[in-house]
From Swiss-Prot:
Family in the record: Belongs to the glycosyltransferase 1 family. Bacterial/plant glycogen synthase subfamily.
Catalysed reactions, as listed in the record: [(1->4)-alpha-D-glucosyl](n) + ADP-alpha-D-glucose = [(1->4)-alpha-D-glucosyl](n+1) + ADP + H(+)
Binding site for ADP-alpha-D-glucose: K15
Organism expressing this protein natively: Rhodopirellula baltica (strain DSM 10527 / NCIMB 13988 / SH1)
Pathway: Glycan biosynthesis; glycogen biosynthesis
Name of the featured protein: Glycogen synthase
PANTHER family in the cross-refs: ALPHA AMYLASE DOMAIN-CONTAINING PROTEIN, GRANULE-BOUND STARCH SYNTHASE 1, CHLOROPLASTIC/AMYLOPLASTIC
Pfam families, per database record: Glyco_transf_5 (PF08323), Glycos_transf_1 (PF00534)
GO molecular function, one term: alpha-1,4-glucan glucosyltransferase (ADP-glucose donor) activity
Entry EC number(s): 2.4.1.21
Length: 507
């Protein structure tokens, strides 16, 4: 298959979140299975900091954004970097950048301290149209376009309208992956003329959404297949609670929403070779090594060194969506009652949460170490050294930290939502007895439920050490590699192409 990935983020060229990890890795793994893959993304300023060689191609063209506005651009080219230590990472995946400085050479990808850029609708309509032209100018066949999030979600509709002629000569299948329903690209209807289409196309079955231009909704109703990043999230976004206004539309599309869990880079996240750890370990010798790593981390962050005290780790954005409205009451209760627990926190976000953590750290330095900001090395050490990882998100499309934790032998306490529900098996008596458990679910999204789940974990850890050992080792043995995810995507790509051909033939 010939597959083109459309994305605004891909490591190491541009990143604000997990989308970059997906689009920087998935195309390489798919290509390694014998498929031809390429990535097309905007030439943001950040590409110059990627340390990857970037060359100028001889391809340039203009996009008529209106009768009076012709916007020119050129294509730059690089490749997704290969890991020299991974013999399976051998496929060459070209990355083409749409270089239009007026739109894309800015300090940030989507906005600044004042909010989203005022011309985001124009910027990403241009990107969608330019990407279609680029596919034509590059000159090789395209079987499927894999669009990611709202910024590229107009492409399926534009291809159906054959606005730039490419779809008239190539029967291109389209798939849209939703990484977070909350971001939809909703703009006023006055942005529609930038698509280059007549107002006849501004209809509810394509671009129009309550007299607005909603990029994501347009992609949902015009792509051949819609996917998201976990089976549970695929179901959740079809409910009013999680659908962000598009739940009924998702329920009504011809094909069911697919859910595929993201993989993790098991070369970077590998406790056997991780250079950030005091002592490396595997599933057969983890127990003593985790104690050594724990003592080293306690010393590093200023907590009293004690191999027996339970160490609870938290990494990520400090926001209520990540469950901090639950975590803070439980944390304060543990500190006020001087419960025998230690907490280590790494993250940034809501200034009010940051300030509370600073104050609590000053008041209880023997129990809490909070680092505001981010350190990749410290994140690795927290994953490896903690006795359990706390992740009570209110919604989590996929989640990665719980997968890192499993690989590092650190059971997770999570809410039963999205990818957390799909990847963490609750330690019920039945699951523990069957050796299937990998963590602990909250009974509901409340501080009391979080405290109860933590207590369940502590009880198993300190009163049933053999069961805890089984739980840790079963978690470490799970396969969350990108190869597993890529195999599922390849099957979905083949089905999407078949569906597209049947739709075009009318069968």
């Amino acid at each position: 298959m010939n597959i083109v990935y459309l994305t605004t983020e891909a490591v190491p060229f541009a990143k604000t979140g997990g989308l970059a990890d997906v689009c920087g890795t998935l195309p390489k793994v798919v290509a390694a299975q014998g498929h031809r893959c390429a990535v097309i993304m905007p030439a943001f300023s950040s590409i110059e900091r990627s340390l990857q060689p970037i060359e100028t191609t001889d391809i340039s063209f203009a996009v008529p954004m209106s009768d009076q506005k012709l916007i020119g651009c050129r294509l730059l080219k690089s490749h997704l970097p290969k890991d020299p230590n991974d013999p399976e990472d051998s496929a060459e995946v070209p990355v083409y950048f749409i270089d239009q400085p007026q739109y894309f050479r800015r300090p940030s990808l989507y906005g600044d301290a004042n909010g989203d850029y005022h011309d985001n609708a124009e910027r990403f309509i241009f990107y969608c149209r330019a990407a279609i032209i680029a596919m034509t100018r590059l000159g090789y066949p395209v079987d499927l376009v894999h669009c990611n999030d709202w910024q590229s979600a107009l492409v399926p509709a534009l291809l159906r309208a054959a606005s730039d002629n490419v779809a008239k000569t190539q029967p291109i299948a389209t798939m849209l992956s939703i990484h977070n329903m909350a971001y939809q690209g909703n703009f006023g209807f006055d942005a529609f003329p930038w698509t280059g289409l007549s107002w006849d196309h501004f209809r509810p079955e394509s671009f129009e959404y309550y007299n607005q231009l909603n990029f994501l909704k347009t992609g949902v109703v015009t792509s051949d297949v819609v996917s998201t990043v976990s089976p549970t999230y695929a179901l959740e976004i079809q409910t009013p609670e999680y659908g962000c206004g598009l739940d009924s539309i998702l329920q009504g599309i011809p094909q069911p929403v697919a859910g595929i869990i993201n993989g993790i880079d098991t070369n970077i996240w590998n406790p056997e070779t991780d250079p950030h750890l005091k002592r490396n370990y595997s599933v057969v010798d983890w127990a003593d090594a985790k104690i050594d790593n724990k003592l080293a981390l306690q010393a590093e962050v200023g907590l009293p060194q004690d191999p027996d005290v339970p160490l609870l780790g938290l990494i990520g954005r400090l926001a209520d969506q990540k469950g901090w409205d639950l975590i803070l009451p439980v944390l304060k209760q543990h500190l006020a009652e001087a419960r025998p627990t230690q907490w280590v926190v790494l993250g940034s976000g809501d200034p009010k949460i940051e300030e509370q953590l600073r104050e609590l750290t000053e008041q209880h330095p023997e129990q809490l170490a909070a680092y505001i900001g981010f350190s990749d090395a410290l994140a690795h050490r927290i994953e490896a050294s903690s006795d359990m990882f706390i992740m009570p998100s209110h919604y989590e499309p996929c989640g990665l930290n719980q997968l890192y934790s499993l690989r590092y032998g650190t059971p997770c306490v999570v809410t039963k939502t999205g990818g957390l529900a799909d990847t963490i098996v609750d330690a019920t008596p039945e699951n523990v007895a069957a050796n299937l458990a990998t963590g602990f679910h909250l009974n509901d999204s409340s501080a009391g439920a979080l405290d109860h789940a933590i207590n369940r974990a502590l009880q198993l850890r300190y009163h049933s050490p053999e069961k805890w050992k089984n739980l840790v080792e079963f978690g470490m043995s799970q396969d969350w590699t990108w190869r597993k995810s890529a195999d599922q995507y390849i099957q979905l790509y083949a089905r999407t192409i078949s569906l597209n051909r049947r739709r075009r033939s009318g069968s």
